[in-house]
Amino acid sequence: MPGRGKGGKGGKGYGKVGAKRHAKKALRETILGVTKPAIRRLARRGGVKRISSLVYEETRAVLKGFLESVIRDSVTYTEHAKRKTVTALDVVYALKRQGKTLYGFGG
């Protein structure tokens, strides 16, 4: 039936509410989600045997800065293409722009 919208069963539309989204939680330091064991595993993969306790906070700070710059460039590519979804190619091009070529994801 025309004019019924996307409701499915029709009706007058009383009580219809848009899609419910998750409520915003108070922003906390999400960088702390990069846990100490995760940093240890990355260091082990790089061949590190012992890690100073000062390394963890410094690693989080460096990682946060790196990700901010890559995400900023990726979003710039996405906006230029008039899209709202960041694609893998946007990230590949952002990394390439920063001199860190990544293979295996197209482009």
Curated annotation (Swiss-Prot):
The keyword DNA-binding is annotated on this UniProt entry: yes
PROSITE patterns reported in the protein's UniProt record: HISTONE_H4
Ranges of compositional bias, category Gly residues: 1-16
GO MF term list: DNA binding; protein heterodimerization activity; structural constituent of chromatin
Any one GO CC term of the record: nucleus
Domain of life: Eukaryota
Record key words, sorted: Chromosome, DNA-binding, Nucleosome core, Nucleus
SUPFAM superfamilies xref list: Histone-fold (SSF47113)
Subcellular location as annotated: Nucleus; Chromosome
Region annotation (Disordered) ranges: 1-23
Pfam families, sorted: CENP-T_C (PF15511)
Cysteine disulfide links: none
Residue ranges of DNA binding: 17-21
Family of the protein in this entry: Belongs to the histone H4 family.
Stated role: Core component of nucleosome. Nucleosomes wrap and compact DNA into chromatin, limiting DNA accessibility to the cellular machineries which require DNA as a template. Histones thereby play a central role in transcription regulation, DNA repair, DNA replication and chromosomal stability. DNA accessibility is regulated via a complex set of post-translational modifications of histones, also called histone code, and nucleosome remodeling.
Oligomer status and interactors: The nucleosome is a histone octamer containing two molecules each of H2A, H2B, H3 and H4 assembled in one H3-H4 heterotetramer and two H2A-H2B heterodimers. The octamer wraps approximately 147 bp of DNA.
Protein name: Histone H4
Species of the source: Euplotes crassus
